[in-house]
Amino acid sequence: MCGRFASSTDPAELVRLFGVQQWDPTETLAPSWNVAPTAKTFAVLDRTPRGQRHPVRQLRVLRWGLVPAWASSADTAVKMINARAETVHEKPAYRQPYASRRCLI
C-alpha cells in the first residue's frame, strides 16, 4: 500500500473473514476504489476494552494515517501513511506503534 488503495469489501464479509467479535453495523462507508491518506476506512484490530483482561477483535472505522507520538495535536499533525517493512521496527515514528498498536486496513 503506497499512497492509495481500494476498499470495496462489505463489512459483514470482513467480520466473517477475520473473526471479528465486536462491530457496530451502523458504521458504514461507501465502497471506494481511490481511498486517499486521511480518509476514513475500515480497520480490523485487537484491543483490550477498559475493565477487561483479554483483547477483542474489532472492526472499526478509522482515519488512515499515523499521528506521530511527538505531535502536539492529532488535528494539526502530519499523518504518516507509509513505512518500509525492513525498517518499521527501527524508525522512531513507527517503533512503538508497530510493537503494540497494529491493525489491518
Q: Can you say where each PLM-predicted feature lies in the sequence?
A:
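Short linear sequence motif anchored by a di-proline
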Residues: M1-L104
